Each structure stands twice: as structure tokens, then as C-alpha cells.
Amino acid sequence: MHFTRRAVSPRASFVFDRHVGTINSSLSRRPRISECVEEEEEDGGGFDLFEEMRQPIQENIPMIILEEEEDDNDNLVMSVARPVRVHFAVDVENLHAHQSVYVVGSNDVLGTWEATRAMPLVQDPDRFMRWKGSIVTDVHQLKFRYFIGYNLMSDQGERLIVDKWEAFLHPRSTLCLAESRNDECRVDRVDLFGYYAGRKCVSDGWLQYPDENQILLRLHGNALKFYKTAKERKNCRVKMTPLDVRFKAPPSGHISFSYGEDEEDEEEDQNVPSNKCTHSATHVAVLSDPRPKFYDQEDTGVTFNNNKDYLVFRTHCLAAEFLAFYIEIFSEERKRIGACYALPSSLQDASGIIHLPFINSSGRPIGQVSIEYLCVRALTRLDGPQFMDQTYCRHWKKRNALEVGHRGAGNSYTKFAMARENTIHSLNTAAKNGADYVEFDVQLTKDRIAVIYHDFHVLVSVARRDGLAMPPPMTREQLDSSNLDYHELPVKDLKLSQLKLLMLDHLSFPQKKENVKKLVEAGEEEEDFKPFPTLLEALTKVDPDVGFNVEVKYPMMQNNGEHECDHYFERNLFVDVILADVMKHAGNRRIMFSSFDPDICSMVATKQNKYPVLFLCVGETQRYTPFQDQRTSTSMTAVNFAAGADLLGVNFNSEDLLKDPMPVKKANEFGMVTFVWGEDLDKKENINYFKKELGVDGVIYDRIGEEERRRNVFIVEREQKRALLSCSGASTPQRAASPSPVSSENNNTSPPHSAKLTRNAQSDSALLEENEDDVEHLSDKLNITGFQSAPMVSTK
């Protein structure tokens, strides 16, 4: 019998030789790999050979033939389309009364991976932890994920908020027809939320709606001040409760004043829905604690000591303009000392610091609390919703350390490099030299175009007047002479066209060293050699096999009191421009984000559900000017912040780790990814130390592949997979080499294949990653020796 599995479609078809005349009604084994052909549909889908191999083998599978037709090869096609009821059952621990469990998946009944259209499950009355549901479908394979959600009210009605979701690279999967008994599938199967295929992977939700916001309130440093206490109070407790100022809050939690109560407008209070709210409860994370994850507040809050503890309070809301917070201060004995309100008028900007006086029960002010706040708004620059079919935000395949090209082929303005840093040519040079990823810095121009450049300022050269009505023309050498003045201007104050046309120099130019590239050279240059390429140009012109480590540059206050760049773009607007470029035009490219600004990291992770985020950390340093933000002051604090913010990992400064490697071990305990950057990586022995002894997941350094030749690990793994399939007699699908090119003249022009956030691009990216992640798995299945994961040690 000739057996061929074709591409998965809404109707799974089995093709066999016409002369056989019958099909076996029970399959006692799986088809060999050589018998399976993996075909690719136009939408990037296809039969997932590896997912099929993971499923338990089912015997005595009934085949119900509903229709017959002949294909071009005179084969009889038997279509199996009888409806099957698929059951879902999942156990979820520590669920709150206002939360429910949902299932989202690959067919329309399950929302086609759109969270807002997911199917709610019903709580089992006999087992309060278990949630159940079922659907009827005729598809061959069904993929799905569970998530925890709750409803909030907005002006447009009720909104489903994703609180926690299963963020596995591979969704759960079932072969509906093959695993069914009497047209019932998964009858006795009970899943455990967040656990699948021997792994645990749960991620926080993301912002889905234009009016959805996440509010973060932070207490740290000398945040609590009492007016009349000679000795500082210790172990005070702080609680923050959100409320909508349009509605009456529950009276039990508020201070009652001895001189009576204010008159309230009861008619207005009657407008509040009885069981719905515009905001979530507030959770708290203690970054100074060994377990910095968010959890529910106690009735008397959480302990805070000045200059010791770092608290972060978090809530979601759909009406930020009416959101206020009731802040209570308790003594160590858990008796309320005082309280105050943070009103919407205090939280008008997207970020800032507020100083609020708090009063006791008699209405007398007794102290002050200082609070930092951040408002994260939803990403609104996309053409459609963000789907849940594939995600890399929590995915990392453990292998030898990846090698990342710093600013492409290396720093060229203060060190020697073969190519000018942060140019298309430099990025492609690093890719040609075998870089797995390239790291570069992204910021915005005055006309809000994302460009690649490291520093926040440039030097503009201006010739001085010499009193002549018509000064004679000057050569470049004369322009480089003492006749020039240099004026420092922020990149944010120059349009892209100005950056392309003006005679600019790097800030280090007055102290120019030998063999160091100038920012702008004399004469004409090819476009790929010029500075200030746009992010869109990089996404479409750089070798698609090399991943991007996109450092989101945002200026910060330094310990010396100097700000890197004052009066910068508002954070939400800034991040949205960069994210929109990547989400629309990245295609299959591997992407990770990073930033020294912890708030930028939180925003990038909260606004999207696809790409991972690393926190860039300076730590304790003598080489660089440290930042004021306490979360960047030590590498250990950076680990706690990243763990609490649900980031993939931390990118450490080599200078700090060479003195104390413990932060890497701490990050490993949290299951986080660790990268390292820094000038110490100019030495090969330091690279080997971080790779082989500390076991970091990635190293970022200059002049990659110049001293020792190497190959991109993803290309090597793909070739190994093809070799394995070739040994087994199977073929592998051919994929497009790169995204369609796009003109760099218009930053808002999308390539034809990515004009919208399409399902096709997402499916392609997921399939590409799945194929490369299953090299070792496939090798084990085939029992073929002599193949291994791509070697990261360079060869001459």
C-alpha cells in the first residue's frame, strides 16, 4: 500500500493506490518518515511531521469514508470529514473568583487564535480547580492554548482581559479523527494549566484594546516621610487600592473622620454596574525580595523600609482618565496610620513622580509619600489584532552560546573596525562573518522615523564667517581645519533628510584617533555604507538568516546629575513606532529587544506577545557613568527586576560579571536567559570564560568572525536537518530567502507580503523555528548517529 500524508487542510485526505481498492481500518504504526511528504500550502501551513511524532500512537483507528474522487495520478482520494466532539479539561490552581479559563485555537469555534473570540470553559461543580468544555469539528488536527482571563467594563462594553496564558512555542495539539473513539476525542484527557510536553511556560497577558492601560506605581528610596517623628518608623506597610472616581467605593476600606461625613450624590453612584469594574485588582512585587514575582496584596499591605525595599504595584484599567488610587499606611503592628488619594489629575503624564501628603483619622496631615508612576498604553499602530498561535516571548532553545555582532561589525568611531558601525554594510558584514545575531541601537528622528544610531547627539560642522561678502569655495581639507565650529545637536531634533544631507561627525571626532571611521566621509558613498539607515531598511536589506538584537535607545538620568537627552519623546509614542516597524516587516527573522531603561523593557513586553525582551544592565562599573535608576545599579537587582517584569532574561556588563558571577547563577535559578556585553569581550579568553565556564546564552562583541571564521548556527542547524531528512529519503520545503524589498524613500510603505499583520507571516515564522528546533529530536527518532547541534567553536 502506498501511503502519503498531504498538507493539513480543513478536510484531511488520505491518498492510496487505486489498485489496492481498500484502506486498512486500523493503523498499528505510524508511517515512516520516508513515507511522509511535508507539503506547504500558500498560507505557510502544512503537515507538522514533528508534532505528529510527539503524539501517542493510537491503534485501531476507524476510517469513515464520506466521499471519493480521483487526483491527477489516478489515485483515489478518500476524505474523512465526519464531525468529532473534542473535549477540553484543564486544572488551574489559585484562580480568583473573578477569573475564568478560556481555550483559543486553530478553528473558528476557538477564535482562530484571537483572544477576544476564545471559547470560555465551564467550572466543574464537583472539582473547583477543573474547567471543561467541548466543540464539534471535522478537522484532522486541532491546535489550542489555555489562558486565564477576566472581564472589565469600558465605554464600549465588556472587554476580555488576558491575565496569564500558555506561551509554549508549540501549542497543544490533538489529532481529532485519529484519537477519537465513537466520535469522541480527549474524553478522559485532563491538562494542567501551564504544563505541556514536560515543560512549564506561563506568560503575562498583553494590552489588546486601544483604551487598555497598565499602571505601575513604584516605592523606593526615601519614599515615606513622617512630619513629627523624630525617629524614623521601620517596617511600615503600604497598600494601594484602585478606584474609579465616577463611582462610590466600598466604605469599609476608607478612613472615617471624627467630624462627620461629606454629602455624596447618591444618584450618580447608582450608575455603577453592580458586578463589573473598569479596573483590575492591584498586585505587588517586591524587587528587593528573593522572590520578586507579582502577588496579591494583603489587607494591610506589604512591608516597606526606606532605602531598603523596592515595591512595584500593578493594575490594568480601561478608563485611565478616571483612575485613582487610595493609599494606606499601616504600622508594623498592622494598625492604620494614615491614608491619601492619588487622583487622576496627579497621573496625567505617562510617567513621573508625585508627592502626596497623607492624613490620619482626624484629618491631620502626618506625613508624605513619594511615588513613581508609569502608564503603559496599548500598541495601536498595527492593522489587526495580535494572535496567539505562535510566540517567542518565553522561548529559548538551549545550545552553545550565540555570538552577536556588536553594532554589526563593531564599534568604528572609537575603535578600529572594517566597516562603519550601525550601517547596512556593517550589519551584512557581520552576517557574512557568521554572526548569529547582530546588535544595533534604534532611536527616532524629529519626523518620528526609527533610525539606527548609537549616540543621542551628533556634531554639526559649521564654517565661521570671515567678513567676506562672498567666501571662496573650500576643499574638504579646509573644511576640516580650524575654520570650522562644531555644534552638538540631538538626533531627535533633526529630520531624516537632514541627517542624510548635513555634514555630521561623531561626538568623539575632536579627539579623533588613527584608523577610526568618520561619521560622514568626503565624496559620494553607496547607500548601504551611509550612517543613519532606517530600521525598515535593516529589516528588508540585511541577510534574513541573521537575527536582530534591537536595543531600544531611551535617554536616562545619570548619577552625575546629567541627563542623556532632555525633553525626549513620550515613551509610549517612542516604543510604538519601533514596535510597529518590527511587527509589520520582520517576516521570519529572529528578533529580540533590549534596553537599558527598565521602563522601556516593561513597555515592550506588555505591548506585544510575540518577541522576547532582555534587560540591559550596567551594574557596578568604573568604566561607564552609572544611571540613577536603582534597578540598573547592580546586576542582582537587574535579575530581580527582569524576573518580576516577566522578561526573557538579562544582558549583563562583562565588567561586573568578571568581579562577581553570582548574578548569572541567580538568573539561571529563575530560568532566565543570560547575555553579556562589554569591552572586556575584546579578549578571546574572556569570551571563552563566559561561554564555557559561566555558560551564558549569548556574547556580544566587536569584529565578529575576523580573527576566526565561523558560521551562523541557524544555517548550520538547517543544513543538518536537511541532511537528516535526505538520509531518510524525505524532502524538505523550500522557503523564500528574504522578505520582499521595500523602497526606503517612504518609511510607511510596507512590503507587499506584510501590508497587514497577516496569519501567513506568523505561520511561516513558527514553522521555521519548529523545523530548526527539532534537529536533535529528529535525529533520535531516526536513530542516526554522527549529527549534532551546530558547533559554536570557530574553525580556521
Curated annotation (Swiss-Prot):
Ranges where the GP-PDE domain occurs: 401-711
Q: Disulfide bonds, which pairs?
A: none
Question: Which EC main class describes this enzyme?
Answer: hydrolase
Q: Where is the composition biased (Polar residues)?
A: 728-765, 785-796
SUPFAM superfamilies (UniProt xref) = PLC-like phosphodiesterases (SSF51695), Starch-binding domain-like (SSF49452)
Name of the protein described by the UniProt record: Putative glycerophosphocholine phosphodiesterase GPCPD1 homolog 2
User: What CDD domains would the database entry show?
Assistant: CBM20_Prei4 (cd05814), GDPD_GDE5 (cd08607)
Keywords assigned by UniProt? Hydrolase
